[in-house]
């Protein structure tokens, strides 16, 4: 395939030119309102400079051309003095030309669009995974673009957009499109030619032969056009006519070969000799094709090889076909073979047409690619005034028709509401068809089935279990702190000032505060648990009933209105359930049965017709509104300058009369249908059987509503309890973590206090021992003065108060930080990292040597704590 070269263009300053035009024609303020549109249009012009050989580049060029065409129709560039510079180069010679004409710009943009389409078609033709139809459509679109250029732009400053050149491009694109169109047919037909041993061999369609002849004819036309252009204008690629000539010869020869095979499939044997003549003719044409000069250039090597192989393969196929056909003719047909020169050419059939430019995209794709008209608001001032008046006329028309439709809908809704339709009609029809009273139906409403599918029984006991565990743990922590406080107090009472450890009450206040907070939380949580349990107990029977699932027969029994009413009824009551409906209408009065059987279908039919009538009316009005809103007569007004505005408006509004007439028809039809429906429904409601069924159905519905409301409340309570249970368990998990941290801190605190007490006791004992040794030394080696002798029968003097140590093993406990459990520190944080102290046995809390026992009755009990 032959792709066309792309042009190059330089930047154009659209922004300044358009802004100046609008400012001079409409005023500077109005020009400022188009700043965004002008900027978008300028970007479009810049984008086409880099448009590629793909669908994106195609869309960019088409979008710019459409917006440029719209702008040109809304301004008079010649009168306004707007003269932007458009610089484009020739696609082959690269000659640059600059002009101010918008037509020059449009012609070059269209050439670029056609060239990109040719490149897309050529690329898709080489892609085996691509549908040949895509390439076919691309070439047809390209042909349409070049046809548009030839029709609209007569004078071209550049050769590649001249009349003769673009018409030649049009023929080339059509030829390539038809070549892609008949590729599949050619492949199937040629495959049949090789099957010479079967009876059905040679059954090839004459249509394929004509299509190939059409391809050859189109390439011949393109060849002649390119040859004439090169001779007259000295312009063009020299390879174009060579390729076109080669394909012309090849497809003409292939058409002759396929046509020859189609003649062999004729019922008359007289055609067999003619078919051999066409085969010989195709061989001559293939020989001519093989001797043609081929294109030059490195980029044509692949084409030349492909062309030689194609012609050689076809020539071999033609020769083998000729050999087998002559053999069959000599043995069987004995038909006279005419000379190839006397045979006429195969009738060409052209199936391709240039796609009009406006049909290149489907409507939805056109809207997507082009987008909104950037300059739709840019119209002449007098047209703006006229369109404003016309818009008021359209609005008045819409309001009038809208009011008519609203009144018609209100009448329909009022009539149906008064008769209770369609609900009463469908319910009555169901009652009569079921053969039993609707009040005894045990169907469970869907909403209750939804409750039953979701509800499960709840177990609230984990709340109490969690609460008890936390309470036990917090009591253990409290007891541990209390025991330490008791021990410290006893040591202080015995050693007095010698026991330098700080009182427990001064350092355990924060821990005790944390314990109280946990206890208070447990009390509050317990109250909430009791409320939750009470709420659940109130709906527990209904919850247990729902939890048994949607197939629970007790649910159906509960909704059985007759079963429920019979339990509370004191005596027998006659209802329609006592009647025999098992035999359908036969159990009723024959006359009444016949009447209902006729009236019910009539009512149903009338109701459906009313529904369809209303839908049709809404659809018509929607279409009518859309038509009115999209109606733009600015072009008509521009072309009708000086005419009577009222006459123009009247003529333009006449196009909406068909919609008005259709709306009127639906309103009239609705009135007749309502009357028929009301008459039939009145007769139905007077029937005694119908009256009884309506009464029983109402009773059943009332009963069902009561039960549904009960289950609704139970379901809502269940959801609240379930949510409360989940939140309660989560609360207890958090509280358990808090209790664990308090317990760890209490244990570390007590261990630290006892270790501190051990150090203090050791210091006291050491000082006492040193003092005794000093006194003994003075007794043995002193001067013997009476002041140094101990008092007869007295106890030794108490040692002095030990000095406060600054190391880690003495003084105030350094391992407990009260701020960690202060009021501003949440429980959820990690407990403070205290210095780890081993837990000594109970009798080793304060060292190996126990302190002197206190006097009194508790002597033995006190000693037991240090052993």
From Swiss-Prot:
Query: In this record, what's one Pfam family?
Result: BRO1
Give residue spans, biased composition: Low complexity: 782-796, 830-848
Keywords in UniProt for this one? Answer: Cytoplasm, Endosome, Protein transport, Transport
* PROSITE patterns hit by this protein: BRO1
Q: Name one GO biological process term.
A: protein transport to vacuole involved in ubiquitin-dependent protein catabolic process via the multivesicular body sorting pathway
Q: Which residues form the BRO1 domain?
A: 1-412
GO CC: one term? Answer: endosome
User: CDD domains per the record?
Assistant: BRO1_ScBro1_like (cd09242), V_ScBro1_like (cd09237)
* Polar residues biased stretches: 803-817
Q: Where is this region: Disordered?
A: 778-867
Write out the annotated subcellular location. Cytoplasm; Endosome
Q: What InterPro entries does UniProt report for this protein, alphabetically?
A: ALIX_V_dom, BRO1_dom, BRO1_sf
Major location (coarse): cytoplasm
Q: Which family does it belong to?
A: Belongs to the BRO1 family.
What PANTHER family has UniProt attached to this entry?
PCD6 INTERACTING PROTEIN-RELATED (PTHR23030), TYROSINE-PROTEIN PHOSPHATASE NON-RECEPTOR TYPE 23 (PTHR23030:SF30)
Q: What does this protein do?
A: Involved in concentration and sorting of cargo proteins of the multivesicular body (MVB) for incorporation into intralumenal vesicles.
By what name is this protein known?
Vacuolar protein-sorting protein BRO1
Q: What is the lineage of its organism?
A: Eukaryota, Fungi, Dikarya, Ascomycota, Saccharomycotina
